[in-house]
Regions:
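Short beta-strand/loop segment that forms part of the nucleotide-sugar
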Residues: 8, 32-42, 63-67, 95
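Short, well-formed alpha-helical segments that are part of the catalytic scaffolds
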Residues: 13-27
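Acidic helix N-cap motif at the loop->helix transition within catalytic regions
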Residues: 16-18, 45-53, 98, 102
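A conserved acidic beta->alpha catalytic loop
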Residues: 23, 40-49, 69
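Glycine-rich, basic loop-to-helix element that forms the pyrophosphate-binding segment
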Residues: 67-86
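Donor-binding/catalytic cores of nucleotide-activated saccharide
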Residues: 74-76, 95-206, 211-229
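Short aromatic/hydrophobic "clamp" motif used to bind/position activated sugar donors
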Residues: 90
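Membrane-interface aromatic/basic loop that binds lipid-linked glycans or pyrophosphate carriers
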Residues: 116, 275-341
Length: 341
């Protein structure tokens, strides 16, 4: 068994993929301890040829899969998780990003030392921010073994993000729950990552950046996030995530925490994304969002967290929705929502 599996979807990254692959080949944990699963998502440039070249040079480390059609990152990652991952731990690294040589060894040793289900780490788009050696790193450990601790954990977004790239996951822990990414959409991660917040018992958080995140102007996410339908996909994935927690996990114990999460991600974030890109807030969309929110949270103002420190935007949005539910004036609501930044 390999110590670590790395899952990497690849699409039209000929300019960057060698930098990524070299950063994996040069890991101090050793190539014999790495399983690198590369899923080419029907690239139209030289990405497949580069993958084949590295696969030939490192046949015991690299497993390459070539999709005949583009199926997006969520489906690629699910294919890897369902069929190929065999390491003790696994992580996701994008094909236009890179990690320092100590990355996998440090995360593996830290996870083993603390018996961690998940390690949350930090990323940076500035290479100067990346810690030069593991001696520069510190971490905190969080143990969610009571309801109160879990609630505190769910309410503190600084501990764990919704990004899959910044996580190192115990395969035995994952096999117990078997979360999946949303498929066929651009904003696929929350359906996989948010349930981790409800289930991981031992979490380590690295305090310094160790993952280099490249802002690729030609990357899929940069392109997708400029499209109206992608923003709507974000909203629908958040609804799917809420329903998953409701159906499969203990939502009753953490109902108010999940409501707060839903207000923020389904409603507030969607409006912020649209406003930031100067996309229209149509009456049809806003009515739909209000209708779904009312179904999920019939008495939205009864949430005890609203108005407490750190929930200003949640309270503001809840007030707007509650006012609309009472007076039905969609024009007034849209004008208020346009002011959200």
């Amino acid at each position: 068994m390999k110590k670590v599996s790395v899952i990497t979807p690849c699409y039209n990254v000929e300019e960057y993929i060698k930098t990524f692959l070299d950063s994996i080949v040069n890991q101090t944990i050793g190539t014999d301890n790495i399983e690198l699963i590369l899923i080419d998502d029907s690239s139209t440039d030289n990405t497949p040829e580069i993958i084949r070249e590295y696969e030939q040079n490192y046949p015991d480390m690299i497993l390459a899969i070539f999709n005949e059609a583009n199926i997006k990152q969520g489906t690629c990652r699910n294919i890897a998780l369902d069929n190929y991952v065999s390491g003790e731990y696994f992580c996701f690294i994008d094909s236009d990003d890179a990690v320092p040589p100590y990355y996998l060894k440090y995360l593996y040793n830290t996870a083993r030392l603390n018996n961690a289900d998940v390690i949350q780490l930090k990323s940076s788009s500035d290479t100067d921010d990346i810690a030069a050696s593991p001696a520069m790193l510190t971490y905190d450990t969080f143990i969610c073994d009571t309801t109160d601790k879990r609630k505190d954990f769910l309410l503190n977004p600084a501990i764990m993000t919704e990004s899959c790239l910044c996580k190192f996951i115990n395969k035995n822990y994952y096999d117990h729950y078997h979360f999946h990414f949303a498929e066929g959409v651009a904003y696929e991660e929350p359906l996989f990552t948010h349930p981790i917040k409800h289930t991981a018992k031992i979490i380590c958080r690295i305090n310094e950046p160790i993952y280099y995140y490249r802002i690729n102007p030609n990357g899929t996410m940069q392109a997708y996030m400029q499209r109206y339908d992608t923003i709507c996909q974000h909203m629908l994935v958040q609804l799917e995530t809420y329903n998953y927690v409701k159906e499969h996990l203990d939502i009753d114990t953490f109902l108010y925490e999940m409501q707060l999460y839903f207000i923020h991600t389904f409603f507030y974030e969607t409006i912020i994304f649209l406003n930031a890109r100067q996309m229209p807030l149509t009456a049809e969309l806003v009515r739909y969002m209000c209708s779904i929110t009312k179904q999920i949270i019939p008495d939205i103002m009864s949430n005890p967290y609203l108005g407490k420190e750190g929930t200003y935007e949640h309270r503001e949005v809840a007030d707007y929705i509650d006012s609309y539910n009472h007076n039905g004036n969609i024009s007034v609501l849209i004008n208020k929502l346009k002011e959200l930044k």
